[in-house]
Amino acid sequence: VLDKTGTITEGKPHVTDLVDVGRVPNLLQLAASLEKNSEHPLAAAIVAEAQKQNLSLLPVEDFVSEPGKGIRGRIKGKIYLAGNQKIIEENGVDIRALERPAARLAEEGKTPMFFAQDGQAIGIIAAADIIKPTSAQAVAEWKAMGIDVVMLTGDNERTAAAIQKQVGIPRVVAQVMPQDKEKEVR
């Protein structure tokens, strides 16, 4: 059983795409300001991209992290929510305008992160990690030895399937919360 991030991939994701629905002029700045308080590797990718673009980060109040789902906080009096599709939908945010781009990004092996402001979708920032050059060969060798190889990931099923195809992993368990990975192994 392999965890995707840092085992199959290098564990150093980078921002690849920004889909802005036009509600805010500075999606990356807002996202990085919120994500700077998170320890997630995807958050680090967003902050790094903002720094690369010399964007100043804004102060965040009332920051809350929900592991495996996302984060929330207040910036200049507005409530921001960032994370996977599940947390966005659980909070009643209409993401119909973002479903098609999110699906396309996931099918490309990228992880779409949704952002909302005061309950309205404002965009997606996608990130991707580089697959280690040895991953496909290692999986092929394990399969040749009769070892059943499984990848666990918190990513959505489309992103997981794209990585699965690139590496040749026979079975994937996607959308696994961090606290549930041990249970999946058993």
Question: Where is each model-derived feature located?
Answer:
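Cytosolic catalytic headpiece
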Residues: 1-186
